[in-house]
Amino acid sequence: MKAKLAEVVEIFTDGACKGNPGVGGWGALLQYNGHRRELFGGEKMTTNNRMELLAVIRALEALTKPCEVRLHTDSLYVQKGISEWIHAWKKRDWRTADKKPVKNDDLWRELDLLTQRHKIEWLWVRGHSGHDGNEYADMLANRGVQTALRGVSAN
Protein backbone atom coordinates (compact mmCIF):
# COMPACT_ATOMS: atom_id res chain seq x y z
CA MET A 1 0.00 0.00 0.00
CA LYS A 2 1.38 3.41 -0.96
CA ALA A 3 1.90 5.95 1.77
CA LYS A 4 -0.62 8.78 1.92
CA LEU A 5 0.76 11.64 -0.15
CA ALA A 6 1.21 15.10 1.29
CA GLU A 7 -0.39 18.10 -0.39
CA VAL A 8 0.97 19.22 -3.73
CA VAL A 9 4.55 20.49 -3.86
CA GLU A 10 5.24 22.90 -6.73
CA ILE A 11 8.79 22.58 -8.06
CA PHE A 12 10.42 24.83 -10.65
CA THR A 13 13.80 23.75 -12.04
CA ASP A 14 16.35 25.12 -14.45
CA GLY A 15 19.88 24.53 -15.63
CA ALA A 16 22.43 26.97 -17.03
CA CYS A 17 25.71 26.46 -18.84
CA LYS A 18 28.30 28.99 -19.96
CA GLY A 19 29.65 27.09 -22.92
CA ASN A 20 28.39 23.60 -23.69
CA PRO A 21 30.35 21.93 -22.30
CA GLY A 22 31.50 24.51 -19.82
CA VAL A 23 30.86 25.81 -16.34
CA GLY A 24 27.26 25.14 -15.36
CA GLY A 25 24.70 25.57 -12.64
CA TRP A 26 21.34 24.21 -11.61
CA GLY A 27 18.55 25.73 -9.57
CA ALA A 28 15.30 24.58 -8.03
CA LEU A 29 12.51 26.39 -6.23
CA LEU A 30 10.22 24.25 -4.07
CA GLN A 31 6.91 25.68 -2.83
CA TYR A 32 4.62 23.94 -0.38
CA ASN A 33 1.88 25.22 1.87
CA GLY A 34 3.21 28.79 1.90
CA HIS A 35 6.84 27.73 2.40
CA ARG A 36 9.69 28.11 -0.09
CA ARG A 37 13.01 26.35 -0.38
CA GLU A 38 15.76 27.40 -2.76
CA LEU A 39 18.42 24.97 -3.99
CA PHE A 40 21.32 25.57 -6.34
CA GLY A 41 24.72 24.22 -7.22
CA GLY A 42 27.21 24.09 -10.03
CA GLU A 43 30.05 22.23 -11.70
CA LYS A 44 33.18 23.51 -13.44
CA MET A 45 32.85 21.28 -16.53
CA THR A 46 29.42 20.03 -17.52
CA THR A 47 26.61 20.36 -20.09
CA ASN A 48 23.28 22.14 -20.09
CA ASN A 49 21.39 18.83 -20.13
CA ARG A 50 23.29 17.50 -17.11
CA MET A 51 22.43 20.68 -15.21
CA GLU A 52 18.74 20.44 -16.17
CA LEU A 53 18.66 16.83 -14.92
CA LEU A 54 20.59 17.62 -11.75
CA ALA A 55 18.15 20.42 -10.86
CA VAL A 56 15.26 17.94 -10.94
CA ILE A 57 17.21 15.25 -9.06
CA ARG A 58 18.30 17.59 -6.26
CA ALA A 59 14.76 18.97 -5.91
CA LEU A 60 13.24 15.49 -5.58
CA GLU A 61 15.99 14.42 -3.16
CA ALA A 62 15.02 17.36 -0.93
CA LEU A 63 11.53 15.93 -0.37
CA THR A 64 11.55 14.10 2.96
CA LYS A 65 8.43 11.99 2.34
CA PRO A 66 6.38 10.77 -0.63
CA CYS A 67 4.66 13.74 -2.22
CA GLU A 68 2.35 14.76 -4.99
CA VAL A 69 4.50 16.99 -7.17
CA ARG A 70 3.86 19.42 -9.99
CA LEU A 71 7.28 19.77 -11.58
CA HIS A 72 7.81 22.67 -13.98
CA THR A 73 10.78 22.56 -16.35
CA ASP A 74 11.71 24.50 -19.46
CA SER A 75 13.74 21.53 -20.69
CA LEU A 76 12.03 19.39 -23.31
CA TYR A 77 14.98 17.01 -22.89
CA VAL A 78 13.94 16.38 -19.27
CA GLN A 79 10.19 16.49 -19.85
CA LYS A 80 10.16 14.17 -22.87
CA GLY A 81 12.99 12.04 -21.53
CA ILE A 82 11.16 11.13 -18.33
CA SER A 83 7.65 11.02 -19.85
CA GLU A 84 8.35 9.28 -23.18
CA TRP A 85 11.88 8.15 -23.98
CA ILE A 86 12.93 6.48 -20.73
CA HIS A 87 10.62 3.50 -21.15
CA ALA A 88 12.28 2.47 -24.42
CA TRP A 89 15.76 3.20 -23.05
CA LYS A 90 15.16 0.82 -20.16
CA LYS A 91 13.84 -1.90 -22.47
CA ARG A 92 16.99 -1.56 -24.58
CA ASP A 93 19.29 -1.63 -21.54
CA TRP A 94 19.91 2.14 -21.62
CA ARG A 95 20.56 2.36 -25.35
CA THR A 96 18.97 4.60 -27.94
CA ALA A 97 17.04 3.33 -30.96
CA ASP A 98 20.29 3.35 -32.95
CA LYS A 99 21.95 1.23 -30.23
CA LYS A 100 24.17 4.00 -28.84
CA PRO A 101 24.47 4.44 -25.06
CA VAL A 102 22.00 6.95 -23.64
CA LYS A 103 23.81 10.18 -22.76
CA ASN A 104 23.71 11.03 -19.07
CA ASP A 105 22.41 7.56 -18.20
CA ASP A 106 23.87 7.91 -14.68
CA LEU A 107 21.53 10.83 -14.02
CA TRP A 108 18.57 9.27 -15.85
CA ARG A 109 18.89 6.13 -13.69
CA GLU A 110 19.01 8.25 -10.54
CA LEU A 111 15.98 10.24 -11.65
CA ASP A 112 14.11 7.06 -12.55
CA LEU A 113 14.56 5.77 -8.99
CA LEU A 114 13.52 9.06 -7.41
CA THR A 115 10.31 9.29 -9.46
CA GLN A 116 9.07 5.99 -8.05
CA ARG A 117 8.64 7.55 -4.61
CA HIS A 118 6.39 10.41 -5.69
CA LYS A 119 3.36 11.10 -7.85
CA ILE A 120 4.73 13.61 -10.35
CA GLU A 121 2.99 15.71 -12.98
CA TRP A 122 5.63 16.86 -15.49
CA LEU A 123 4.90 20.31 -16.91
CA TRP A 124 6.87 22.03 -19.64
CA VAL A 125 7.04 25.84 -19.56
CA ARG A 126 8.63 28.07 -22.17
CA GLY A 127 11.91 29.42 -20.83
CA HIS A 128 12.52 33.16 -20.49
CA SER A 129 8.86 33.95 -21.12
CA GLY A 130 8.04 35.72 -17.86
CA HIS A 131 6.87 32.65 -15.91
CA ASP A 132 7.70 33.66 -12.31
CA GLY A 133 8.70 30.21 -11.04
CA ASN A 134 10.85 29.48 -14.07
CA GLU A 135 12.51 32.89 -13.94
CA TYR A 136 13.34 32.33 -10.28
CA ALA A 137 14.78 28.87 -11.00
CA ASP A 138 16.85 30.45 -13.78
CA MET A 139 18.24 33.00 -11.30
CA LEU A 140 19.14 30.15 -8.92
CA ALA A 141 20.83 28.21 -11.74
CA ASN A 142 22.93 31.26 -12.56
CA ARG A 143 23.80 31.57 -8.88
CA GLY A 144 25.00 27.96 -9.17
CA VAL A 145 27.22 28.96 -12.10
CA GLN A 146 28.74 31.71 -9.95
CA THR A 147 29.47 29.31 -7.07
CA ALA A 148 31.18 26.93 -9.50
CA LEU A 149 33.26 29.77 -10.90
CA ARG A 150 34.34 30.76 -7.39
CA GLY A 151 34.98 27.14 -6.41
CA VAL A 152 32.55 27.41 -3.49
CA SER A 153 30.37 24.43 -2.66
CA ALA A 154 26.67 25.34 -2.77
CA ASN A 155 23.70 24.01 -0.81
UniProtKB/Swiss-Prot annotation:
It is an enzyme of class 3 (hydrolase). It is found in: Cytoplasm. Binds 1 Mg(2+) ion per subunit. May bind a second metal ion at a regulatory site, or after substrate binding. InterPro entries: RNase_H (IPR050092), RNaseH-like_sf (IPR012337), RNaseH_domain (IPR002156), RNaseH_sf (IPR036397), RNaseHI (IPR022892). Mg(2+) 1 binds at D14, E52, D74. GO terms for biological process: DNA replication, removal of RNA primer. Mg(2+) 2 binds at D14, D138. Keywords: Cytoplasm, Endonuclease, Hydrolase, Magnesium, Metal-binding, Nuclease. Residues 5-146 form the RNase H type-1 domain. GO terms for molecular function: magnesium ion binding; nucleic acid binding; RNA-DNA hybrid ribonuclease activity. It catalyses: Endonucleolytic cleavage to 5'-phosphomonoester. The keyword Magnesium applies. Its cofactor is Mg(2+). Its EC number is 3.1.26.4. GO terms for cellular component: cytoplasm. Belongs to the RNase H family. HAMAP family: RNase_H. Monomer. PANTHER family: RIBONUCLEASE H1. Endonuclease that specifically degrades the RNA of RNA-DNA hybrids. This is Ribonuclease H. The gene is rnhA.
